[in-house]
Amino acid sequence: MTYFVMFLGFCFILGAVAVASNPSPYYGVLGLVVGSVVGCGWLLSLGVSFISLALFLVYLGGMLVVFVYSVSLAADPYPQAWGSWQVVIYGVGLVLVVLVGIVVGDFVGVWNLWVGTVDYGGLGAVRLDFSGVALFYSWGAGLFLVAGWGLLLTLFVVLELVRGLSRGAIRAV
């Protein structure tokens, strides 16, 4: 289980590097999907399956919206791929920054914190994510209404910015 969680962490870092070094929106969404799948798998290994599933659905829904907007705004006839030299050098630089951060964190002693997985805690009467679901539906309702209103407002702002003089996303057919 430990090696699997370490593998998930390694894949999460690779997904973040893929997002940071994306040459075009077509390839950046692949890094986002890898990062979300691996991050939710990491949460699943910690024993919070409901929150992992909810975050996975939210991530994929949000990423599809972002992907559609970014592709419609930056439609390149010849997009750069990850194999071009500029992107490879940038990706290698990001991996080196991550490795330096790991070495410095190990030297300072940041990595001495330990989190147990599902196997560590044994059998419990109430799982952590089930009590979180109760709070999610009771105290979190107002927060989610405010967050939904903010996202709707953001959607209208982005649509208005995209429209400009050429009536980009909002057109009369």
UniProtKB/Swiss-Prot annotation:
Organism the protein comes from: Struthio camelus
Keyword hit for Membrane: yes
An annotated GO cellular component: mitochondrial membrane
Chain ranges passing through the membrane: 1-21, 27-47, 48-68, 87-107, 139-159
Catalytic reaction annotation: a ubiquinone + NADH + 5 H(+)(in) = a ubiquinol + NAD(+) + 4 H(+)(out)
GO molecular function, one term: NADH dehydrogenase (ubiquinone) activity
E.C. numbers: 7.1.1.2
Cross-referenced InterPro entries: ComplexI_Subunit6 (IPR050269), NADH_UbQ/plastoQ_OxRdtase_su6 (IPR001457), Nuo/plastoQ_OxRdtase_6_NuoJ (IPR042106)
Family: Belongs to the complex I subunit 6 family.
UniProt-recorded name of the protein: NADH-ubiquinone oxidoreductase chain 6
